[in-house]
């Protein structure tokens, strides 16, 4: 019915005011169209001009930044550069000067770490958000504030209780998923970061961090709350606790109870380690 109504509206717009004439017309006896056209006066050039066709295709969308090409060599370059760093200061300088990762080209700031490097606990999150990108520090937005309150509940602060970073040092444009090359490059620096910080306890916040650092396909819901180990290059084993990312807790408040259990386990482990 909508199609019929649209057709009738079109007829009205074209000036049609009747559907059936008062007198019948014998179309077979009418002269052919060619004869009518020949008898009609010549149309002006303006009348012969073809009407502007309606656009039938949508206008082109704005071009997007091309997805970086995967390159295993870039990952190897990052590993080699990270291995040459013997201090955290050298590592930070190397990361800030590294131009191989496409994420850096669209980020406002390099987000390295925050807190005391010699703190007993090192937290590794996922990626900088808009607030972190703007300020150049990890976990400073709403989820970061929740992280601070959580750690404070077991007596840990950034002033000396815990040291915090992410596996990515630059915010992905539009929060897109990083490519395997981008993640591999950043992971090379993160692994060296953990080596140099040598915390007593390592906390991995979020499924992305857990899968990358532990090199596992297991999901965060199956791993959280269970102690595992992270082994350094010299054989040192660091007790490691996978836990939910605070951003997830903001979306799923019911999971805060499980995270509280994780925090209590971390507090107990620190007591055991002295």
Give the residues covered by each predicted segment.
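Conserved nucleotidyltransferase catalytic core and NTase-mimicking acidic/glycine-rich helix/loop elements
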Residues: 1-7, 13
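A polyanion-binding, active-site-adjacent surface
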Residues: 10, 17-18, 22-274
């Amino acid at each position: 019915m909508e199609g019929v109504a649209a057709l009738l509206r079109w007829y009205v717009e074209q000036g049609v005011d009747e559907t059936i004439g008062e007198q019948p017309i014998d179309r077979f006896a009418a002269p052919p169209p060619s004869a009518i056209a020949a008898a009609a006066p010549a149309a002006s050039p303006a009348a012969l001009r073809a009407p502007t066709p309606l656009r039938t295709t949508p206008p082109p969308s704005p071009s997007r930044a091309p997805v970086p090409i995967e390159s295993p060599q870039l990952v190897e370059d990052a590993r080699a550069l990270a291995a040459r760093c013997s201090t955290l200061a050298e590592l930070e300088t190397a990361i800030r000067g590294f131009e191989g990762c496409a994420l850096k080209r669209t980020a406002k700031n390099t987000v390295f770490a925050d807190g005391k490097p010699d703190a007993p606990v090192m937290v590794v999150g996922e990626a900088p958000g808009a607030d972190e990108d703007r300020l150049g520090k990890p976990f400073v937005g709403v989820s970061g504030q929740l992280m601070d309150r959580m750690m404070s509940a077991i007596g840990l602060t950034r002033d000396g209780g815990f040291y915090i970073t992410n596996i990515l040092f630059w915010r992905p444009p539009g929060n897109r998923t990083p490519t395997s090359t981008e993640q591999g490059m950043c992971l090379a620096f993160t692994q060296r970061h953990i080596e140099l910080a040598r915390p007593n306890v390592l906390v991995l916040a979020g499924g992305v961090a857990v899968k990358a650092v532990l090199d596992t396909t297991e999901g965060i819901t199956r791993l959280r709350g269970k102690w595992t180990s992270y082994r350094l290059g010299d054989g040192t084993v660091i007790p490691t606790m996978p836990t939910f990312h605070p951003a997830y807790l903001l979306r799923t408040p019911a999971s805060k109870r499980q995270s509280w259990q994780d925090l209590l386990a971390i507090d107990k482990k620190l007591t055991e380690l002295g």
